[in-house]
Curated annotation (Swiss-Prot):
Function according to Swiss-Prot or TrEMBL: Catalyzes the desulfonation of aliphatic sulfonates.
Molecular-function annotations in GO: alkanesulfonate monooxygenase activity
Protein name per Swiss-Prot or TrEMBL: Alkanesulfonate monooxygenase
Entry keywords, A to Z: Flavoprotein, FMN, Monooxygenase, Oxidoreductase
Gene3D superfamilies xref list: Luciferase-like domain (3.20.20.30)
Source organism phylogeny: Bacteria, Pseudomonadati, Pseudomonadota, Gammaproteobacteria, Enterobacterales
Family to which the UniProt record says this protein belongs: Belongs to the SsuD family.
Length: 381
């Protein structure tokens, strides 16, 4: 099975070390463009663009990278409860059309009550997933060309429609990750690819089996992906030294503050990540070549595969054997580590190198009449 390898645009900051200004670098448009073009040339399928109050806006960043890349896809966040599903459907179709079918979407429900409150969202965990389910139903139906009336608990629309369809049909692929039962139910019902963070293989296997069974019970099949950091070097010893250097400037106070912030979230996945190390830095190799040091201060994905190319490739293939076909990777600094992955890891994997998409002809149509309907063809005399 050929593997889809994704990289990451660090719109929330980048550098040589975690938890310190030492070794950091400005993340401006030119730097993000460098990373995107490098990923494009090396053969990555796409890039994940993160979302949240600590990040640059993912949609604007993705749009700005379209003209400077050729085949790279953009995995961009959809934010239920923050954005209307009808507006999000128009945005998604436009991004897909402007990128010639290179748009992918990642459903993000949110987990930090403080951040959500700052965005005007005051739903609890279960309510957010209810709202996300309703959002996704409306979003998918619009992109499939329906005129939508929907009267849900959280979302109400009447006569919603999309004038400009996406290139990818029936709609651009929808990714999603979540570890709670309600999250897995949403994945089984509505998404195309279920993402998990990089837990040890036995735990990942259990989650995949749960989601696969739930999808099958609904008459659906679903793909799987995993989100991991990587530290790849020419030798295993060099890779582990690089891992140690990454957290060399971390002090106990910074770790404690980060763990306290993670503890206030209602994300089951985040709590599972934190439990891998319990905020302690003395036993961070939690599974062969799987290192939890990143999660001491970074929310979300908190583990890295560490080693030389053949070793990391072997670990990736262990995950692939569980049914995972997409790997969303990152590493510090993201420009240099992209080259390390492309040059030291890719030769040991069966990587699905994307082709440059051919331009897709768009439907010819005149300006909408009264913003209400597409004009008819002229009558033949």
């Amino acid at each position: 099975m050929s593997l889809n390898m994704f990289w990451f645009l660090p719109t929330h900051g980048d550098g040589h070390y975690l938890g310190t200004e030492a070794g950091s670098r400005p993340v401006d448009h030119g730097y993000l463009q460098q990373i995107a073009q490098t990923a494009d040339r090396l053969g990555f399928t796409g890039v994940l663009i993160p979302t949240g109050r600590s990040c640059e806006d993912a949609w604007l960043v993705a749009a700005s990278m379209i003209p400077v890349t050729q085949r790279l896809k953009f995995l961009v966040a959809l934010r239920p409860s923050v954005t209307s599903p009808t507006v999000a459907a128009r945005q998604a179709a436009t991004l897909d059309r402007l990128s010639n079918g290179r748009a992918l979407f990642n459903l993000v429900t949110g987990s930090d009550p403080q951040e959500l409150a700052g965005d005007g969202v005051f739903l609890d965990h279960t309510e957010r997933y209810e709202a996300s389910s309703e959002f996704t139903q409306v979003w998918r139906r619009l992109l499939q060309g329906e005129t939508v009336d929907f009267n849900g608990k959280h979302i109400h629309v009447r006569g919603a429609k999309l004038f400009f369809p996406a290139i990818q049909q029936p709609y651009p692929p929808l990714y999603f990750g979540g570890s709670s039962d309600v999250a897995q139910d949403l994945a089984a019902e509505q998404v195309d690819l279920y993402l998990t963070w990089g837990e040890p293989p036995a735990q990942v296997k259990e989650k995949i089996e749960q989601v696969r069974a739930k999808a099958a019970a609904r008459g659906r099949k679903i793909r799987f992906g995993i989100r991991l950091h990587v530290i790849v070097r020419e030798t295993n010893e060099e890779a582990w030294r690089a891992a140690d250097r990454l957290i060399a400037h971390l002090d106990d106070d910074t770790i404690a503050k980060a763990q306290a912030a993670f503890a206030r979230t209602d994300s089951v996945g985040q709590h599972r990540m934190a439990a891998l190390h319990n905020g302690k830095r003395d036993q961070l190799e939690i599974s062969p070549n799987l290192w939890a040091g990143v999660g001491l201060v970074r929310g979300g994905a908190g583990t890295a595969l560490v080693g030389d190319g053949p070793t990391v490739a072997a670990r990736i293939n262990e995950y692939a054997a569980l049914g995972i076909d997409s790997f969303v990777l990152s590493g510090y600094p993201h420009l240099e580590e992209a080259y390390n992955v492309g040059e030291l890891l890719f030769p040991h994997l069966d990587v699905a190198i994307p082709e440059i998409p051919q331009p897709q002809p768009l439907h010819q149509q005149g300006e909408a009449v009264a913003n209400e309907f597409i004009p008819r063809k002229a009558a033949q005399s």
